[in-house]
A protein has these predicted regions:
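Catalytic cores of secreted/periplasmic lytic hydrolases that degrade extracellular macromolecules
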Residues: 18-149
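Sec-dependent N-terminal signal peptides
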Residues: 4-13
Length: 149
């Protein structure tokens, strides 16, 4: 009987300790945010280990018109990711899924070198001035400039 009681108490203590550690873990702010901001997209891209994060954040701003476009609001699609097979823009449950999809659908092709040249090479955007606009946004947007450091 003493062994059973000891075992029950020990298991209860271990379970309580485990549960308290789970409660202590903080969920990163970007994971629970309903609407994207440059700072949250930056954190999310860093979490998913995207490369050239500053450019990726600039793309999200440019593609969504500062997160105000229909594709952003209704599809949670921050990058204008398009399914050429079904001829539709991808829909995501959350904007965070869009960031993760960017890595899977765009960056998996990237090996090294000039990222702007890579985007041009894969015909990322139809706009012939896209890279110029992206570079300008990367340096001129005051809201975004805090992310450069």
């Amino acid at each position: 009987m003493r062994k059973i009681l000891f075992t029950v108490l020990l298991c209860t203590s271990v379970l309580n300790l485990h549960c308290s550690k789970i409660r202590e873990r903080k969920v990163p702010e970007f994971m629970t945010a309903k609407r994207p901001t440059p700072e949250l997209v930056y954190q999310c891209a860093k979490h998913y280990k995207l490369q050239h994060i500053n450019i990726v954040v600039a793309q999200s701003i440019l593609e969504t018109g500062h997160y105000k476009s229909d594709k952003c609001i209704n599809y949670n699609n921050l990058f204008g990711l398009y399914d050429s097979k079904n001829k539709k823009y991808y829909r995501f449950n959350t904007w965070q899924e869009s960031v993760k999809a960017y890595k899977q659908k765009v960056q998996y092709k990237y090996k090294s070198g000039d990222y702007y040249a890579f985007l041009k090479r894969i015909n990322y955007a139809k706009d012939p001035k896209y890279i110029h606009k992206l570079k300008k946004l990367s340096w001129d947007d005051l809201e975004y400039s805090c992310l450069l450091y």
